Amino acid sequence: MERKKKKVFKVVVTAHKGDEEFLPYEIYDESKGVWIEDESHEVIRLIFYPEVPERFLSVLREKAGFTKYEVHEEPVKDYGDVIKRSFRPLRIGEIYVIPPWVEKKGYGKSILIEPGMAFGTGRHETTKIMILLMKEVEFKGKEVLDAGCGSGILSIYAYILGAKKVLAIDNEESAYLSAKKNVAINRASCVEVKKKDLRELEGEYDIVLANLDMNILRNHMSQIVNLAKPDGKIILSGILSSEKRELLKYIGNLRIEGVKRMGGWVGLILRKT
């Protein structure tokens, strides 16, 4: 007997590029995920599939500050069908980011990411920049810190690149749980995921990954630098091109060894001298 179709709610927000960086984590708690589509160089569409629409819209208005949005109803047999239609394999440089239900065979080097649990599905320019910059750095045998790991995508790529040990941290519960799950399904054995704040960390690392927004970098850049070993490298993104000049004030004697730009965002490879 065919199952009766139920309705799924889709919420669409048109926003400026960069707004998605500041989505509160309550958004991820109330939605099956967020998908980002480019409308133009400066405009994006954020697509959500909330389980309880009224509660989600309250968070969208009161926490995220969006008051204009579209709500659509879609009849589906299975909620999972919506997710599978919305999340397809994505190529970034040499790597493919694919959802767990897609067969890895034929995709070469790939990262399995459960979509929507936390920021970091590979769709955003800052994640793409980080992955492309990471390819330019030697990871084999290195100890790596992924500060603000989100979905864990960068930690998993560090594992693929041959890192000896990776510590992935995030102070948000949903990101921590997402990274734990993604690390497990990728069997990234060298990656340890912890719910921690940057200020709680000690020790030094060969490579520090920091895909963070400018406000966090402004307040914590000295801490990030201290976590890198002498001659270690820091790979940064989450910086708007217009903010690069300000960032240069905080990097001190760090040497810039690589720069990549994409869609109004910039990323840097820095060496601690």
PLM regions and their residue ranges:
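N-terminal auxiliary segments of SAM/dcSAM-dependent transferases
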Residues: K6-K105
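Non-catalytic positions within long, well-ordered alpha-helices that form the structural scaffold/packing
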Residues: I27-Y28, Y159, A184, V225
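Conserved beta-strand segments of alpha/beta enzyme cores
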Residues: G33, K68-E70, Y96, K165, ...
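Conserved beta-strand termini and adjacent loop/short-helix elements that scaffold enzyme active sites
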Residues: H72-E74, I98-P100, E114, K194-K196, ...
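SAM-dependent Rossmann-like transferase core, predominantly class I methyltransferases
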Residues: K77-K140
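Conserved SAM/SAH cofactor-binding pocket of Class I
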Residues: T121-L201
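S-adenosylmethionine
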Residues: L132, N171-T273
